[in-house]
């Protein structure tokens, strides 16, 4: 089983991933993105999908017109893990 993040690792997320926040209702991190239009939002989602495949770790997400919300959590760990951090950092590189 994949280990969950420790309390110290969670506390470090504020500095490590300043654009992400802890989800209110579950053990996950989330980030909201806004783009000029739907085409840009969908293009971003396509790039994230390819990245997620490379990481073998897939986000939960939603899209409404020019907005994309991404939520990361590791089901095998029952919450946040290092896999979520690595994918969030990679997604930040695309934004």
From Swiss-Prot:
InterPro entries: PCD_sf, Pterin_deHydtase. It holds the Pfam family Pterin_4a. One of its GO terms (biological process) is tetrahydrobiopterin biosynthetic process. Keywords: Lyase. It is an enzyme of class 4 (lyase). GO terms for molecular function: 4-alpha-hydroxytetrahydrobiopterin dehydratase activity. Its EC number is 4.2.1.96. It catalyses: (4aS,6R)-4a-hydroxy-L-erythro-5,6,7,8-tetrahydrobiopterin = (6R)-L-erythro-6,7-dihydrobiopterin + H2O. CDD domains: PCD_DCoH_subfamily_b. Belongs to the pterin-4-alpha-carbinolamine dehydratase family. NCBIfam families: PRK00823.1-2, PRK00823.1-3. This is Putative pterin-4-alpha-carbinolamine dehydratase.
